[in-house]
Swiss-Prot record:
Its EC number is 2.1.1.-. It is found in: Cytoplasm. The keyword Transferase applies. This is Ribosomal RNA small subunit methyltransferase G. It comes from Dehalococcoides mccartyi (strain ATCC BAA-2266 / KCTC 15142 / 195) (Dehalococcoides ethenogenes (strain 195)). It is an enzyme of class 2 (transferase). It holds the Pfam family GidB. Signal peptide: none annotated. NCBIfam families: rsmG_gidB.
Length: 235
């Protein structure tokens, strides 16, 4: 895990032997499970360290606290939520993943890593966000899903408590995308707080973190029914 260790040192993060072993286990189980269920196209040892583990950890640049209540929307193989949970074991983590096969992997890997305080939520984001158990209950919401920022705003901000934040990893030139998302962000009760450049060893390819602050309650009609935020973004 030398690539990961080097990158984390740039973030001021050092791992215990237990945490290092958790990352090794995560790597082995991910590659093994991926041979049966399509979780990721990235399977090389160094690539996973950089493009999955360190990329997930880069959210620490947004000032993550160890006692956050974090929701990872569209978690897939667990990124960025599970690496953040390994690094910050005191946080409470929700992994939202609608695909049953992926949700099953999340349940199994969480158990094998010995993590506690993790909830697997196997629902569509549009449905879960209308559930009082999850709506506006998180201090931090993230999603590494490949979606336009206008769509992501509608799928993430309703989960975020007022005063909390959404941190969305992005890549490349996002100026036009952010302009298109302005209306959706406002309608969800959010505002753009900052955009952080990610410049870490092995991750010097234009990655950014878009940080949204939740400043008011999301109106009850949002998010719209399943599929609408992606099909017809609020722009």
């Amino acid at each position: 895990m030398n690539k990961l260790i080097c990158g984390l040192s740039s973030l001021g993060i050092s791992l215990s032997s237990v945490q290092l072993e958790q990352f090794e286990t995560y790597y082995r189980e991910l590659v093994d499970y991926n041979s049966r269920v399509n979780l990721t196209a990235i399977t090389g040892y160094e690539d996973i360290q950089l493009k999955h583990f360190l990329d997930s950890a880069s959210l620490a640049l947004a000032g993550i606290k160890g006692d956050e209540k974090l929701l990872d929307v569209g978690s897939g193989a667990g990124f960025p939520g599970l690496p953040l949970k390994i690094i910050f074991p005191g946080m409470k983590l929700g992994l939202l993943e609608a695909t049953q096969k992926k949700a099953r992997f999340l349940s199994e890997i969480t158990a094998k890593l010995g993590l506690t305080g993790v909830e697997i939520i196997s629902q569509r984001a549009e449905d879960a966000a209308q559930n009082p158990l999850y709506r506006q209950k998180y201090t931090l919401v993230t999603s590494r899903a490949v979606a336009d920022m206008a769509t992501l705003a509608e799928l993430t901000l309703p989960f975020c408590a007022v005063g909390g934040r959404v941190v969305a990893p992005k890549k490349g030139d996002i100026e036009e995308e952010m302009d298109r998302a302005a209306s959706a962000i406002k309608k969800m009760g959010g505002r753009v707080s900052e955009i952080i450049k990610v410049d870490l060893p092995g991750l010097q390819d234009g990655r950014k973190l878009v940080v949204l602050e939740k400043i008011s309650n999301t109106l009850s009609q949002y998010p719209r029914r399943a599929g609408m935020p992606a099909k017809n973004p609020l722009i």
